[in-house]
Amino acid sequence: MAVTKAKKIEVTEKLTEDFKKANHAIVGTFNKLTVSKDYELRKAVRSVGGKYSVVKNTLAERAAKGTKIEDAVKGLAGVTSVAFTDGDPVQLAKVLSKYAKDNPEYEFKAGVVDGKVIKLADIDALANMPSKEELYSKLLFLISAPAQRLVTVMNATGRDLAVVLNQGVEKQKFSGGEAPAQ
């Protein structure tokens, strides 16, 4: 059954809308992917706030005109799928890299991060990076650690004095008795 021109226009408009919202995308291809594996991939991409579409190459090129994804979808051949997000590109890359390792029939064609086309090797490097949340927590720790150490040192002086006084009282060195002989 042939797809009507109206349906193609509708698909192109929806893709254009999605591509304009997306800052990051990973273009892939697959061979002999089963329905259950495709569903698994879509579910994984949705779990990190992304969208996944299998698209015709010409429709993808038309839809991507004037968007950040335009350079990544130029001149595509074969079966093409696009996973895109306006959220964290690291999470998307992690999900797709894990899926590609588990399913050799899925391969990367191109990637876009913040509107810049990245190499295929960079997709794996992106997947190995910590997520934004992990980076924020590490940064917060690095910022708070010196202040925490300062408070510990400041408290140590008072604590050490209290320990010395307590030991003196326990050994009765501070009892108002006679002075030691000189």
From Swiss-Prot:
Pfam families: Ribosomal_L10. One of its GO terms (cellular component) is ribosome. The keyword Endoplasmic reticulum does not apply. It comes from the Bacteria. SUPFAM superfamilies: Ribosomal protein L10-like. GO terms for molecular function: large ribosomal subunit rRNA binding. GO terms for biological process: translation. Disulfide bonds: none annotated. Keywords: Ribonucleoprotein, Ribosomal protein, RNA-binding, rRNA-binding. Signal peptide: none annotated. InterPro entries: Ribosomal_uL10, Ribosomal_uL10-like_sf, Ribosomal_uL10_bac, Ribosomal_uL10_bac_type. Forms part of the ribosomal stalk, playing a central role in the interaction of the ribosome with GTP-bound translation factors. Belongs to the universal ribosomal protein uL10 family. HAMAP family: Ribosomal_uL10 (MF_00362). Part of the ribosomal stalk of the 50S ribosomal subunit. The N-terminus interacts with L11 and the large rRNA to form the base of the stalk. The C-terminus forms an elongated spine to which L12 dimers bind in a sequential fashion forming a multimeric L10(L12)X complex. PANTHER family: 39S RIBOSOMAL PROTEIN L10, MITOCHONDRIAL. This is Large ribosomal subunit protein uL10. It comes from Koribacter versatilis (strain Ellin345). The lineage of its organism: Bacteria, Pseudomonadati, Acidobacteriota, Terriglobia, Terriglobales.
